[in-house]
Amino acid sequence: MASEGVGQNLHDHVLVAGHNFATENKIEQSALHGSVAIVYGKSEISNGVRDLMLNVSTTPSVLPPLQSPDHGFKTTFSFTKPKSRGELRLKDLNPFSQPLIDHNIFSHPDDMRGAMAALNLSREILGAASFDRFGGTEQNQSFLENQAAMRSLIVKGSTFFGHHSGTCRMGAGEDAVVDETLKVRGVEGLYVMDASVIPNISSCPTNALVIAMAELSATKL
């Protein structure tokens, strides 16, 4: 097919790790895959839609070169309504060649503003008096001294949730890869049903959304 939209509109929830508190005493680990609580919030650019997500955990771990204590607690956080868009392209016609992927994260300034809001919310929550009993010491202080340093922490601590979406965008216009029935435009009998058809990613993990879409589409095919 020759649709210019194939592989475009790539986006995901960028997961930022690195806001850690070290404690002298070991904190009991959670059996819930590390997360003991999830916090949702709204940034100043949210337009009323929740766009911040924090995972509070008792298993401190981050990406190098950020400091990770042996004992303590942390948040990993995300701005969940990203505006940056990347692309996924074929390297060549060899099906065994690795694709060319450009996530292009933080190319839209609002995404960094949202991530900064999530970090500030994390600092507000973990710095609250209710956490004093753990005797935690905030780590990575050199990355928290000013706005530029905090942006550096966000960039160095960024990875992905694995909620990649949008590269086979659904829409009513001819520029969309699939139509509202999930049929690929220009290809007879071909349908797509996964997160790639989502035009704009949901503010929550995509698992439930994709399951619901798949159940609905299965009844219509």
Where are these regions (language model features)?
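Mid-to-C-terminal "cap/lid" subdomains and adjacent gly/pro-rich loops that border
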Residues: 1-80, 124-129, 148, 152, ...
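A glycine-rich dinucleotide-binding beta-alpha-beta segment and adjacent secondary-structure elements
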Residues: 55-57, 130-202, 207
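C-terminal segments that line or cap access tunnels to active or ligand-binding sites in enzymes
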Residues: 57-64, 70-135
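Short, conserved micro-motifs enriched in small and acidic residues
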Residues: 109-113, 201-208, 212
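An active-site-proximal "capping" alpha-helix that borders the catalytic cofactor pocket
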Residues: 210-221
